[in-house]
Regions:
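Bacterial N-terminal signal peptides that target proteins for export
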Residues: 2-12
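Hydrophobic helical h-region of N-terminal Sec-dependent signal peptides
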Residues: 13-18
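Bacterial lipoprotein signal-peptidase II cleavage site
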Residues: 25-30
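Mature catalytic domains of secreted/periplasmic carbohydrate-active enzymes
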Residues: 31-620
């Protein structure tokens, strides 16, 4: 349980997601009951007892073996009561240092107190590290445990997964993905009719905790399943929605489209044989919206993917396996976050029964329905077990090995990474797979009628260019309304992006990261949907700011301001090799240029460009 603040102790007790490291208990895939059970893998925890430390005054040291180069949380285990000085706990591990109050605390089933720091430790390499803790507190043990976003599996499926991932089919699909660079994400469903408002109350004003994005309507208002289902009776979008959206994606310069075939609410936009809670059987539309959009996208020369919430299903997925996970976590004193789980009106079946009867079959249905499907974008993996995650991946591969699977299938079985919702990784981060950032055009994924905080075209282009320069893809979201119409402010920004991309496409499609991502501009990380909503966008750009991509013998320097005067690109100095030719993409005019020890000097006199910027192509 969570503990209230004690006198003299600066604890910021917060409800944050923190789950134990789980794996499937049974090898019998057909055994629905045992597939819901799981056991903890505390063998992946590093436990350092106080009695084993080398003590020097109030300093305690251990030698620590890091076997997995991932992100860890640091916890301190106290016996019974807190010490008055327990806020003064300093931890040093290798080059890392933690000097802050604890972020959360809880009691174990043995009545011990576990306190955890908010700061995490990211180890990039395996090996030995020295850990030192300096404190006068009467602690019992130090725990170094994998952060909940970095579960460590048993490894028993790794070789089989790797063989599939490295297959010619998967690698060809990844080559396509790396070249595509820019895709459209679509969050659309029953919730789109409500526009983020339920019975006159805006979702932002909901009294319940949890995300306030429009597609979480059912969760935000704890709407009973049968009541929420009534929305299906009025869901009747315009028949032109598919062609309109496909054309918008094409005009925006996007190469692929990914739509929510089933979000957390459990409603399917396709004609499912496994459930009648779908577009054909439950709505007056009486047609397969996924198939229609798929065909419209193919007609526009676009590739197609589907989002599928496999872990969360508020209609048929009971409590999302919450009770089983919580039982294990309670025994370890680990808080189990209920966010995203239906605890107000769960279906009477087990979560494993939902997987067997609905989720696994629907994945196979989608792949068979869409022969040229490019990828499945899984979501809601929080309490999915290692065995279940692998089964989803293998099911996709066995049905069509050309279909890519994203990271959120769970347990690191994805073919590529996603950086997180509206998150762009640092240029210094080392990622072991190709990656993608998904982002919004305002502050919601689904249609929120009152959210007019639209990102400007310049802001969206900045995110896109920043992502490309770091070697990733950008999956940019739209949220159509209940009729399938895209808000004009959102569509306008996408079309303006498309006009810029059309001129500068040589610097975009098929490019890779250059030796450095940018110059002139200090890195400002986009750190989540809520972060952008709260902080806004205040960045400005000058003629000294450039982002780089490369392809073959060419380096592209991308500017986000109009072409004017003379520019100096420092990173293209003589140290990079001899530049043989320079041109401005989209212009037929020759430019005067000179490569020096200081950089590449280019005169832009007489060059016309978009107000959103230009691209210098340097051929080596």
């Amino acid at each position: 349980m969570y503990l209230s603040k004690r006198k003299g102790i600066a604890y910021a007790i917060a409800l944050v997601i923190f789950t134990s490291i789980l794996s499937c208990k049974s090898n019998n895939k057909a055994d629905a009951k045992s597939n819901d059970e799981a056991f903890d893998q505390t063998s992946n925890w590093i436990l350092l007892d106080k009695t084993d430390a080398i003590k020097d005054g109030n300093s305690y040291s251990w030698s620590v073996d890091i076997e997995h180069p991932i992100v860890y949380n640091v916890q301190v285990l106290f016996e019974n009561e807190f010490s008055e000085n327990s806020e003064e706990v300093n931890v040093n591990i290798g080059e890392h240092s933690i000097k802050e109050p604890f972020n959360k605390s809880y009691k174990t089933y043995k009545n011990e107190i576990v306190s955890e720091f908010k700061q995490t430790i990211d180890f990039n390499e395996i090996g030995k590290e020295k850990l030192t803790i300096i404190t006068d507190a009467d602690f019992k043990q130090i725990r170094i445990i994998p952060n909940f976003r970095n579960p460590i599996g048993s490894g028993k499926h790794h070789e089989e997964w790797l063989a599939m991932h490295q297959s010619p089919e998967k690698q060809a699909a990844l080559a396509w993905f790396k070249e595509a660079k820019f895709g459209m994400f679509i969050h659309w469903g029953l919730y789109s009719q409500a526009g983020g408002i339920w019975k006159g109350t805006k979702i932002n004003d909901s009294a319940y905790p949890g995300p306030k994005v429009a597609e979480w309507l059912m969760h935000a208002f704890r709407i009973p399943r049968e009541e929420y289902k009534e929305l299906a009776k009025t869901f009747n979008p315009d028949k032109s929605f598919a062609q309109n959206i496909a054309k918008l994606a094409k005009d925006a310069g996007m190469k692929y489209v990914v739509i929510t075939s089933k979000h957390h609410d459990g409603f399917a936009l396709f004609d499912s044989k496994s459930s009648d809670y779908d577009m054909v059987d439950a709505t007056p539309y009486k047609a397969d919206a996924i198939k229609e959009l798929y065909e419209a996208c193919l007609s526009e020369g676009l590739d197609f993917g589907v989002y599928y919430s496999h872990g969360n299903d508020w209609n048929d997925g009971t409590d999302g396996n919450y009770a089983n996970v919580k039982k294990i976590n309670d025994s370890l004193g680990i808080f189990t976050h209920p966010s995203g789980k239906n605890l107000w009106d769960p279906s009477p079946n087990t979560h494993a029964e939902y997987l067997e009867m609905k989720a696994y079959p629907q994945i196979k249905e989608l792949i068979n329905l869409l022969p040229k499907l490019r990828l499945i974008w899984f979501d809601g993996e929080g309490f999915i077990t290692e065995e279940q995650s692998f089964r989803f991946y293998k099911l996709v591969y066995d049905t069509n090995p050309n279909v890519l699977v994203n990271k959120r299938v769970g347990w690191d079985f994805g073919d590529y990474l996603d950086a997180g919702d509206n998150k762009i990784p640092s240029a210094d981060e080392t990622l072991d797979k190709y990656w993608e950032t998904c982002g919004t055009t305002n502050n919601s994924w689904g249609y929120k009628s009152y959210d007019d905080d639209w990102k400007s075209t310049q802001e969206l282009l900045y995110y896109f260019v920043d992502i490309m320069s770091k070697g990733g893809n950008y999956l940019l979201n739209i949220g159509p309304d209940g009729l399938g119409n895209v808000p004009e402010a959102s569509a306008k920004g996408l079309r303006e992006m498309g006009a810029w991309i059309k001129v500068n496409q040589e610097a975009i499609y098929g490019v890779s990261r250059w030796k450095i991502p940018n110059e002139g501009q200090e890195e400002t990380l986009l750190d989540g949907t809520g972060h952008r909503a709260a902080k806004g966008f205040k960045k400005t750009f000058t003629s000294k700011d450039f982002w780089f991509t490369t392809k073959g013998n060419k380096v592209y320097a991308i500017s986000l301001v109009p072409a004017s005067g003379k520019i100096l690109i420092h990173s293209l100095n003589k140290n990079v090799g001899v530049i043989k030719n320079v041109r401005i993409l989209g212009s037929e005019k020759d430019v005067e240029w000179k490569q020096t020890e200081s950089g590449l000097e280019v005169s832009l006199t007489g060059i016309e460009s978009s107000k959103y910027g230009f691209v210098v192509e340097a051929s080596l």
